[in-house]
Amino acid sequence: MAGFQSSEVDPNTKNKNAEEMFNELNKVPFFMQSLEDVGDESENNVQLDALKALAYEGEPHEVAQNFREHGNECFASKRYKDAEEFYTKALAQKCGDKDIEIACYSNRAACNLLFENYRQVLNDCAQVLQRDSTHAKAYYRSAKALVALKRYDEAKECIRLCSLVHPNDPAILALSKELQKKSDDFEKRESEKKRVAQEKVIAAKTVLLALQERHIKTKTTEHPPDLGDAMISLSTFDDPKSELFFPTILLYPLVYQSDFVPSVSENCTPLELLKTVFQSPAPWDVHQLYNPDSLDVFATTDTLGLIKVGKNVPILKALTHPKVTLIDGLVQLHVVPHHLASDWISSWKKNKQENAKN
């Protein structure tokens, strides 16, 4: 074709996608979208230095407007980080042009809304509203950020002010609906939290009253065991006369084993508890000595002595024994095969005497 010279197309170009082509063009000064992120190869590029100088040439409002326009171009092409940087550079000029500053603060808020930098969104929108108290987008973006931060009352006020300017705007109506739902859900959760917290306080006081009414002595040590969620409880949390339940540990001292039962009724007997625990033989009971009917149960006294607990009487009876104290809210019962109980008791007494000497 007249006036044009043919040239060979770089074969590597065919294998490049759009993003790679854009990155290549961005290294050419004329096409650059950012004058900062240019790589080492451009350090001595005279054309680039000239372009950098041009970017800041002119009156402050002209420089700011130039950066603003670059920001708008980047935003339109969804390069939000670059857009945010250009708006920041525009604002750094402090040009004093109200319209430019409003646009840059507002658009930077839009970028930060996408980045979920909600506090920066609020800061930028506040700058907009200082310059224009009727700026609908500033109220809208503030509301979006406040919803994300769960500051629902403030968000409602922003939407109200925004609606005064654009009462039928679909985005505002949708945000208002979203806010109402989230606000209602939040209030329900907070109400439930308060209810649960109040019940816990009432339950704790009622448990203390229930223990007192049953004449059960209690003691809390400096380092109580971690029982997880298990605790003394009542079948009706605010009724001290309702059924009382205790975390209970069964200790098998002859085999150094134990079973923890999170909740045992005060009316449960040791035999009933043992039958529940030993429904299936324990893997450590290789000699099958732990048959509920052939086991003896003991509780410790305040002086570290032992009392035998009847297997067919409620556990409450052991807890109300004048020499027994409920320690750290945990019922502790020692379980020993009947034919070995005598020797174990002798060993217990011997250890107690030796500890007393020391």
Swiss-Prot record:
InterPro entries in UniProt: Csn1/TTC4_wheel, TPR-like_helical_dom_sf, TPR_rpt
Pfam families listed in its UniProt record: TPR_19, Wheel
Gene Ontology CC: cytosol; nucleus
Keywords: Chaperone, Cytoplasm, Nucleus, Repeat, TPR repeat
TPR repeats: 64-97, 102-135, 136-169, 221-255
GO molecular function, one term: Hsp70 protein binding
CDD domains, A to Z: CTWD_TTC4 (cd21381)
Predominant subcellular localization, coarse grouping: cytoplasm
SMART domains reported in the protein's UniProt record: TPR
Subcellular localization(s) per the UniProt record: Cytoplasm; Nucleus
Primary role: Co-chaperone that binds to the molecular chaperones Hsp90 and Hsp70. Stimulates Hsp70 ATPase activity, but not Hsp90 ATPase activity. Involved in only a subset of Hsp90 functions.
Quaternary structure (record): Monomer. Component of Hsp70 and Hsp90 chaperone complexes.
UniProt record similarity statement: Belongs to the TTC4 family.
Official protein name in the record: Hsp70/Hsp90 co-chaperone cns1
Taxonomic source organism: Schizosaccharomyces pombe (strain 972 / ATCC 24843)
